[in-house]
Amino acid sequence: MIDRKALLNDLKQQVKAVEADLGKQVKALDEVGARLRAEYDQARKLGRTAATWNSWLDERVTQVAVAWVLGTVFVRFCEDNRLIPEPYVTGPDNYRRDLAETRYDVYVEADDDPTYRGWLRRAFAELGDGQAGRLLFDSDHNPLYQIPLSHDGARELVEFWRQRDEEGALVHDFTDPLSADGTEGWGTRFLGDLYQDLSEAARKTYALLQTPEFVEEFILDRTMNPAVREFGYEELKMIDPTCGSGHFVLGAFRRLVRLGGENQPGKDVHQRVRAALDSVHGVDINPFAVAIARFRLLVAAMAASGVRTLDEASKYEWPVHLAVGDSLIKSGSQQGSLFGESDDDLTDELAEFKYATEDVGEHPEMLRPGRYHVVVGNPPYITVKDKSLNALYRELYPACAGKYALSVPFAQRFFELAKREDAEGSGYGMVGQITANSFMKREFGTKLIEGYFGHAVELTEVIDTSGAYIPGHGTPTVILVGTRRGGDGRSPVIRTVRSVQGEPVAPENAEEGLVWRAIVEQIDKPGSVSQWVSVDDLDREKYFSKQPWVLADGGQEMLEQINAASHAILKRDLHRIGFYGIMGADDAMSAVPRTFRRNNAESEYVRRLVVGDEVRDFRIADGDDAFHPYGSQRDLVGPDAFPNLAAWLWPYRTELGGRATFSGGTYFADGRPWWEWHQLPKDVGAHAWSLNFAFVATHNHVVLDRSGCAFTRTAPVIKLREGASEEEHLRLLGLLNSSTAGFWLKMVSYPKGGDPVGDEGARVSVHPWSDRYEFTGTKLQEFPLPSEYPTGLGTALDALAQRLAAASPAAVAAEAVPIAGLLREARTRWEAIRSRMIALQEEMDWQVYSLYKLHSEDLRVSEDPDDTNIPELTLGGRAFEIVLARRVAAGEASDEWFKRHNSTPITEIPAHWPAPYREIVQKRIDAIESNRAIGMVERPEYKRRWATEGWDALQEKALRSWLLDRMENRDLWCDENGQPTILTLARLTDALSRDEDFASVAKLYAPRKELAKVVAELITDEHVPFLSALRYKPSGLKKRADWEEVWDLQRKEDAAPDEPAKRKIRDSIPVPPKYTSADFLRPSYWKARGKLDVPKERFVSYGQTNAATPELYGWAGWDHREQAQALATYFTNTALSTKEITPFLAGLLELQPWLSQWHNEFDMLYSGSPADFFAGYRQQKQGEHGLTDDDLRGWRPPAATRRRRAAAKQ
């Protein structure tokens, strides 16, 4: 029996080895390369692909490599299970192993050109003999015949299969004896594992994903069973247009064989098997998926018919209707409309074109619309990366819109293939699919829902499986069942399974998961409700005619209740809602504020840049700044206005100019200024302030920005019209931060994921409150507005948030030396303010319930936010938390909410609260337990988490930042003449020890550590070496060389006499490669520099080795002249050997181009230009030590030596 995991792991390596071999073969064999290139050119011409030649070829090589490896898998399976009489490669016992080797020896002696490749092809030919096996190794289409494996490559593959372990047993033994009745043994499920994970590149390209058998069986129950009841089984036709490794096809085949045996036991078994094979069909774009499906179906047919060898199978006419091709591609005339009409008679050139690996064209009826009684499958969920295919599918399938996922065109295609009604209006084919549920709430799904599903077809069942544990399915899913009936003849209701609660823990057996079992057991019981799901026949028009679909139990009803209390929607009051702008170059244009200060950036062109994660609890957390080259009217300003910033950005000019534009060109090609943002609306007619919200978060977070920050796409803006009052802003701030708004948004928004259950990629989370959602402006602008607003509480919370920020450790440290007394006082204020905010948020939530008529009574303590009857609240003391704590105590709920938020659960209303507040809280608890609407929204999923790092963590971070800022004091890094100087760590520590404020804060930061240790630890992750060879690994040094070449060309461009000459040079400059973390010698260097290698570190380190904490440091705020001065001063004043001075001279050589660029003017200090001075001085030193420029460029640090562990004491 095969070890599935070991086989998969080993074969992954074999595929990589074969890919490498085939890549060499393509280059060595001109005919092969030319043939593939011609195929690619034709495909690109017809719009079948927009991929580059190299990426297309890489994908084809992967397909061929997998085909070679899978071919040998099929051979090995047949050898070990005696499907062929004599082995070609090996066998589990010594006899068959020796026989295989002997047979190969005989072949070598007899054949004119014997190779291992030729021997494997003989094995493939034997397996492919006969009508059923022919498709397995069809030389016209099987990818392995596209590129010949080398003799050595084939030999290594054979030798791999012959490996034995220490006991002499075959490492990969496929023996799986078939039982007498053919129902057990010959298992091929392992091939599904190979299909999904054999090639990482293929898995990503085709979104390979196995459908678990229990899901496949369920969908066949809901589709094939009714089809058999209506049409019978003998003439039934089924297809899986995305068949993958064949799970649905095999499931349908086995059902049909069983039905034939039950209903016609006297009929010849071979005829029954033939009839079942003739009924099932499958198509997949992935050649090796279809190869696996064909092999599995052939083995299943043999088992079902009692045939035990391939030779015997070749005597029967067994049709195998499985084809390779893109089942979405059809003639343009078949594109139809959202209402389902199409003309099936015409063809076009693109529909006729097929890749060499595709054979669907040899099955002309396979994809004929209206042919099938059953259409089932699990279509891919990915978006279409290839631009040509994306446009083609959009043209062929009107349901495609926006950034659609493949689930959209496949939803339409599945129904198109299903049988239409007969003359009497009956006889519709059944369609079933498990698919991504993203179309239900993301914008691209609107046309599919409101157009196609709304009119062209009849959905009969919608089953929310997002809460079920389905291994491998990391994307939330839904099962759709229906027919091709459209228009008025459809049933007014749809059987719907809605979610109540997700799977609490990963089940040992996914099929026995609590949610899945509830779905199976309740699906035929409308009106049933369990802890996990509810089942109802819901009105088609009311629940499914408009986007979004809401499949949370009671969710749609709650939305309608909220909407019914609305007097308008949010977009009525807005100038616009959407992105602030798109920088398009965040790595180059943004950095922490100190980086801009260090480079003397022109402050009027630097703005605070806010990301979504910083928008929390009515305030904006500290973060990065951004280059913002715009005036007050958002008109672009030229580099002359910001010379320091322009110099800082100069190294990235080609990268910035090479950015893609909306037209498909580049900034340079389209004549766009290289320094501008990608997109920045002028917002004429909008208020200067903005409300901003977190685009992806577990809960709704909205802030009011009065300071004119810039925001990334993760923090969209809500702009009111010019002239809007502060009150208009604040009333929306309060409303949009309410739990009611959180509920509404989560019902209509797409869930991004949370804390997953299990480790098999199943998209279920234990705690719904930890699920992140995508809150888009398109959804939010439809938010219903009540007639009144929680303006007073919104205003109070906004003011408290500003006070909270002013009491934070970072704010204290910014205003004064952060001594213990100040921090203690600030902590008291901070905790009190935060507790007050928790209390007022609770008041606001309950006020809003009454505004939307979710509860008849306004359960606030008072209309005055400052009322003393409202106590300060700590987490754990809100009404819903008391209810939750009681459920935890009763063993009915998890206590994770309290653990995660460091709060104490309480089951009784605290006696020290004011009496009016205790009474109100009791009423709130009563409402939660008796009012369904309140019970739905008063849950952790919708209540503000107030998640924070906590004071201690905030204080530690603030103290660390203060200490590091103090260590950057320019005076520390200058000598008595004001010139830059390199310091040893000991000298730096000594200087800092004389700073009483530094010493006292360091003691507060790390009370049990010596100052020297504190300074060393602080600087360890904040420095980057002065020399490339000490920063990068070899791969990074190669990229650095590319960047230096780009900079040389940019300097030539700057020196060119006129614009035509400049443009000619500019057009020849390649966009340099981006760095990755793997290019840097230490993670801290990568963290400081990023993929464009932008210097954002605090300190520069010097030395001769790659050390975590070197002995020599400088300040990163030095310009190139100051860096050169510090280096030259150091090796002038320090006695260094040739070996020791080499890296320092190399550092000076690396600075030379920058000195020539920025410091080439006369300077009295150097009696000439600094560039000339340092060049001459370096050359003098090189001469003294006999070093050439190449010696300096070739210098590398010595390899690190591992210290031997001390011997353990005896």
Curated annotation (Swiss-Prot):
Q: Which reaction does it catalyse?
A: a 2'-deoxyadenosine in DNA + S-adenosyl-L-methionine = an N(6)-methyl-2'-deoxyadenosine in DNA + S-adenosyl-L-homocysteine + H(+)
Question: Null-mutant phenotype, please?
Answer: Strain is no longer resistant to plaque formation by bacteriophage phiC31 (a Pgl- phenotype).
State the EC number(s).
2.1.1.72
- Induction per the UniProt record: Constitutively expressed, probably part of a pglW-pglX operon.
- Give the recorded effect for residue 381 to A: Does not restore phage resistance to a deletion mutant, very little DNA methylation occurs in vitro
Q: Where is the composition biased (Basic residues)?
A: 1201-1210
Instruction: Fetch the InterPro entries from UniProt.
Output: DNA_methylase_N6_adenine_CS (IPR002052), DUF7008 (IPR054277), MethylTrfase_TaqI-like_dom (IPR011639), N4_N6_ade-DNA_methylase (IPR050953), SAM-dependent_MTases_sf (IPR029063)
SUPFAM superfamilies named among the record's database cross-references:
S-adenosyl-L-methionine-dependent methyltransferases
Q: What class of enzyme is it?
A: transferase
Top-rank taxon:
Bacteria
Q: What NCBIfam families does UniProt report for this protein, alphabetically?
A: BREX_2_MTaseX
Similarity comment text for this entry: Belongs to the methyltransferase superfamily. PglX adenine methyltransferase family.
Q: What else is known?
A: Phase reversion of this Pgl system is due in part to the expansion and contraction of an 8-base long guanine tract in this protein (corresponding to residues 259-263). The tract has been observed to be 7, 8 and 9 nucleotides long in different derivatives; a 7-G tract yields a 282 residue and the 9-G tract a 336 residue missense protein.
Q: What is the stated purpose of this protein?
A: BREX systems (bacteriophage exclusion) provide immunity against bacteriophage. Part of a type 2 BREX system. Probably a DNA methyltransferase, it methylates phage DNA in vitro in an S-adenosyl-L-methionine-dependent manner. Previously called the phage growth limitation (Pgl) system, it confers protection against bacteriophage phiC31. The bacteria allows one cycle of phage infection, but subsequent cycles are impaired, protecting the original bacterial colony. The system undergoes high rates (10(-3) to 10(-4)) of phase reversion, i.e. loss and regain of phiC31 resistance.
Protein name as catalogued: Adenine-specific methyltransferase PglX
The gene behind this protein is: pglX
